[in-house]
Amino acid sequence: MAFELPNLPYAYDALEPHIDKQTMEIHHDKHHNTYVTKLNSAVEGTDLEAKSIEEIVANLDSVPSNIQTAVRNNGGGHLNHSLFWELLSPNSEEKGEVVDKIKEQWGSLDEFKKEFADKAAARFGSGWAWLVVNNGQLEIVTTPNQDNPITEGKTPILGLDVWEHAYYLKYQNKRPDYINAFWNVVNWEKVNELYNATK
């Protein structure tokens, strides 16, 4: 198979009480695994099997039209979730160069969190909220479904899944509560690493 489900870098219950064990098990083992399975099925026998998922999603226009939708949805789902797991950590420490850059652009970390949370909560239906690097500047964007900002030439360095499957077992229809809890488990070390890689 061309693409594989990555292991979580922590235990299923490591993010509790903010993200519960059952949600993590279903989200990783079922939802993400399904994206991988369907992506592999779509690209089987094509030259896409030899490409990285980042390269594929960044160049969706070059994907054959008969599999483009399947690759966009499932390739995006695989890429987004692979990144999402790494952006979470039970040891969240708000420090590093990216935090300084956020404070410089937004005035404070709280102002940044408020704008990010507002945009994540306002994302209609299923999708993602992102902090991206765009031409050297930080920007908050949202994408529908499993779309990823790299398709538009932007580099995601922080992402939040706001599909209901990411939070409904614990938070039901209270998406803002889930968004607030997210800040307790952000892996700022990884965010910094991704930010520094864009320089």
Curated annotation (Swiss-Prot):
Its EC number is 1.15.1.1. Keywords: Iron, Manganese, Metal-binding, Oxidoreductase, Stress response. SUPFAM superfamilies: Fe,Mn superoxide dismutase (SOD), C-terminal domain, Fe,Mn superoxide dismutase (SOD), N-terminal domain. GO terms for molecular function: metal ion binding; superoxide dismutase activity. The keyword Chaperone does not apply. Binds 1 Mn(2+) or Fe(3+) ion per subunit. The keyword Cytoplasm does not apply. Mn(2+) binds at H27, H81, D161, H165. It comes from the Bacteria. It catalyses: 2 superoxide + 2 H(+) = H2O2 + O2. Fe(3+) binds at H27, H81, D161, H165. Disulfide bonds: none annotated. Its cofactor is Mn(2+); Fe(3+). Homodimer. Belongs to the iron/manganese superoxide dismutase family. Destroys superoxide anion radicals which are normally produced within the cells and which are toxic to biological systems. Catalyzes the dismutation of superoxide anion radicals into O2 and H2O2 by successive reduction and oxidation of the transition metal ion at the active site. This is Superoxide dismutase [Mn/Fe]. It comes from Staphylococcus epidermidis (strain ATCC 35984 / DSM 28319 / BCRC 17069 / CCUG 31568 / BM 3577 / RP62A). The lineage of its organism: Bacteria, Bacillati, Bacillota, Bacilli, Bacillales. The gene is sodA.
